[in-house]
Amino acid sequence: MARRTWLGDILRPLNSEYGKVAPGWGTTPLMAVFMGLFLVFLLIILEIYNSTLILDGVNVSWKALG
């Protein structure tokens, strides 16, 4: 028999929807938007690291971190 804990009681409502599937596409478009925004974020970080995005007055060398 599983022991009841206060953390389990708090998290139980999150698990009450287990196994249920939203009809149609559900939240897929929202997820796609956030994935696109995350991709843009990663591209900006890559461009800063690769110095293809020039930021005046910002030194991006490893020596500047030390």
Swiss-Prot record:
It is found in: Cellular thylakoid membrane. GO terms for cellular component: photosystem II; plasma membrane-derived thylakoid membrane. Keywords: Membrane, Photosynthesis, Photosystem II, Thylakoid, Transmembrane, Transmembrane helix. Disruption phenotype: Not essential for photoautotrophic growth, however PSII is less stable, a considerable amount is missing the oxygen evolving complex, and it is missing PsbX. Its main location: membrane. PSII binds multiple chlorophylls, carotenoids and specific lipids. GO terms for biological process: photosynthesis; protein stabilization. Signal peptide: none annotated. It is a single-pass membrane protein. HAMAP family: PSII_PsbH. PSII is composed of 1 copy each of membrane proteins PsbA, PsbB, PsbC, PsbD, PsbE, PsbF, PsbH, PsbI, PsbJ, PsbK, PsbL, PsbM, PsbT, PsbX, PsbY, PsbZ, Psb30/Ycf12, peripheral proteins PsbO, CyanoQ (PsbQ), PsbU, PsbV and a large number of cofactors. It forms dimeric complexes. Part of a photosystem II (PSII) assembly intermediate complex PSII-I; crystallized from a strain deleted of psbJ, it forms monomeric PSII before addition of the oxygen evolving complex. PSII-I includes 3 assembly factors not found in mature PSII (Psb27, Psb28 and Psb34). This is Photosystem II reaction center protein H. It comes from Thermosynechococcus vestitus (strain NIES-2133 / IAM M-273 / BP-1). The lineage of its organism: Bacteria, Bacillati, Cyanobacteriota, Cyanophyceae, Acaryochloridales.
